[in-house]
Amino acid sequence: MLKPSLNAAAKWMIRNTIVSNESLTPEINLHLITIASPLWMSTPDACPLPDPYWAFYWPGGQGLSRFILDNKPLFQGSEIVDFGAGCGSASISASICGAKKILANDIDRYALLSTKLNFHLNNLRDSKIQYSSINFLDDKNERMSTQFFTDSKNIRKFILLGDMFYDSDFAELLFSWLKKIQDAHMVRVLVGDPDRHPLAESEYLQRYKTKFTKNQLAEFSLPGYVIKEHYGFNTAKVFELKFQ
């Protein structure tokens, strides 16, 4: 598949997605492929961009973004890394709440483009947001992934992850990296997830080499249309992970 230029991709996204706020976060508008979109039932060849996961508002991202918006004082003046940013909802929510500095990270450059378009859609200045497609889980990029956070102990720091736990092998890599960042910068790790197996079931949790505690901060009931769009998950939960 030939990959379109970013300019061509932006035009395609705007033309072929629906601007929607039908979610747990009606304050936020997003360019999405929803059940009301002609692309919903299309075959993959109808989309010139590979795997447009960034055009869907996944349950964990909805729950995490709702939690951020509901806890504005916690995120005001903070430093944020939105890991696996996708559509950018967590970054947008943090910006609305007054985060001081935001890094939207996704290895797919079209996801970062989607995040940027959604920032503009919500009339947010993106001067305080940085975009990076660096794979932070690659050992050679470890130093780069720690440079974003300041050394100040007076600034709250967060890594935000929505819907990242589909696979236990990937989760193991992710936990190892998160522990390094948390140890180095006293970063809080917040996760939005609808209880997918790698983060929910004890047989997986006991097997991971990197040990952590999982504290549930919130649980949100998903609207019926979200349940229908996302494989029957009924709720989205927000957890804080503390590594040992």
UniProtKB/Swiss-Prot annotation:
The keyword Transcription regulation does not apply. InterPro entries: Ribosomal_L11_MeTrfase_PrmA (IPR050078), SAM-dependent_MTases_sf (IPR029063). GO terms for cellular component: mitochondrial matrix. It comes from the Eukaryota. The keyword Transferase applies. Its EC number is 2.1.1.-. GO terms for biological process: methylation; negative regulation of fatty acid beta-oxidation using acyl-CoA dehydrogenase. One of its GO terms (molecular function) is protein-lysine N-methyltransferase activity. Keywords: Methyltransferase, Transferase. Belongs to the methyltransferase superfamily. ETFBKMT family. Probable methyltransferase. This is Electron transfer flavoprotein beta subunit lysine methyltransferase homolog. It comes from Caenorhabditis elegans.
